Swiss-Prot record:
This is Centromere protein O. Keywords: Centromere, Chromosome, Coiled coil, Kinetochore, Nucleus, Phosphoprotein. GO terms for cellular component: cytosol; inner kinetochore; Mis6-Sim4 complex; nuclear body; nucleoplasm; nucleus. The modification Phosphoserine is found at S35. GO terms for biological process: centromere complex assembly; chromosome segregation. Belongs to the CENP-O/MCM21 family. Component of the CENPA-CAD complex, composed of CENPI, CENPK, CENPL, CENPO, CENPP, CENPQ, CENPR and CENPS. The CENPA-CAD complex interacts with the CENPA-NAC complex, at least composed of CENPA, CENPC, CENPH, CENPM, CENPN, CENPT and CENPU. Component of the CENPA-CAD (nucleosome distal) complex, a complex recruited to centromeres which is involved in assembly of kinetochore proteins, mitotic progression and chromosome segregation. May be involved in incorporation of newly synthesized CENPA into centromeres via its interaction with the CENPA-NAC complex. Modulates the kinetochore-bound levels of NDC80 complex. The keyword Nucleus applies.
């Protein structure tokens, strides 16, 4: 008896048809996923657009209030004594500064900058974050008078608050707040990386992590194979830019070896590049995933 021909009249096997159907289903599934992601992005853009529109409207309203108050004051200037005129001008300037601070806090609340009015002026709260992780918060209590001054604050002593205030507080309060935010966010980011290294990758460290209070100078020794016979690396990370979360100067040496082989020298240089371009805990996560083999994809 002759066997049945598994091919259809057009020469296509059943297996080929099924494989084609599976490819079509995969393409449909991928297209559906891309469509859903596009809709999500469009929804987020729409929400941000609405928020921007509200903030601009708030800014225009505040400007209108300031213009109205200026007009009211100017209308009364002709009927007051010279000393009274000076007092009115000073009061007008202070009110304008207060309105400016309120507008800044309203407009930039989503960046981690918020605050509330007090009997003396305004108390500003700066919430820091790194890689989407909310970290520490700090406050600065400002007295709105002439000159503006800081009444209380919780900023660490090693943050150059007085220097920042001397530069910007009297002339540009927005620049003062944003500059302070930069310093605090960078400090929190460096501290977060050092904490993660100690808590998550202690097995790779061959000694204690040494750091100063500002966390802009770190030094440590580590081995990629804790139980192996390889020599430990010694790393020194210096952050000259106190508003940065990546080091400006990195030195990696191989402990106990005067002359390195070509492979060890390449690995040492690769480590320096990684520490300069990626957060500390991400570099050690790469070491953990790859063992002794360095994950060079992080360098690109």
């Amino acid at each position: 008896m002759e066997q049945a021909n598994p091919l259809r009249p057009d020469g296509e096997s059943k297996g080929g048809v099924l494989a084609h159907l599976e490819r079509l289903e995969t393409q449909v599934s991928r297209s559906r996923k891309q469509s859903e992601e596009l809709q999500s992005v469009q929804a987020q853009e729409g929400a941000l657009g609405t928020k921007i529109h509200k903030l601009r409207r708030l800014r225009d309203e505040l400007r209108a209030v300031v213009r109205h108050r200026r007009a009211s004051v100017k209308a009364c200037i002709a009927n007051v004594e010279p000393n009274q005129t000076v007092e009115i001008n000073e009061q007008e300037a202070l009110e304008e500064k207060l309105e400016n601070v309120k507008a800044i806090l309203q407009a930039y609340h989503f960046t981690g900058l918020s605050g509330k009015l007090t009997s003396r002026g305004v108390c500003v709260c700066i919430s820091t974050a790194f890689e989407g992780n909310l970290l520490d918060s700090y406050f600065v209590d400002l007295v709105i008078q002439k000159p503006l001054r800081i009444h209380h604050h919780s900023v660490p002593v090693f943050i150059p608050l007085e220097e920042i205030a001397a530069k910007y507080l009297q002339t540009n309060i927005q620049h003062f707040l944003f500059s302070l935010c930069e310093y605090l966010n960078a400090y929190s980011g460096r501290k977060y990386q050092a904490d993660r290294l100690q808590s998550d990758f202690a097995a790779l460290l061959t000694g204690p992590l040494q750091r100063n209070p500002l966390c802009n100078l770190l030094s440590f020794t580590y081995k990629l194979d804790p139980g192996g016979q390889s020599f430990p690396f010694c790393a020194r990370l210096l952050y000259k830019d106190l508003t940065a979360t990546l080091p400006t100067d990195v030195t990696v040496t191989c402990q106990g070896v005067e002359v390195l082989s070509t492979s060890w020298e390449e690995q040492r240089a690769s480590h320096e590049t990684l520490f300069c371009t990626k957060p500390l805990h991400q570099v050690f996560a790469s070491f953990t995933r790859k063992g002794e083999k360095l994950d060079m994809s992080l360098v690109s």
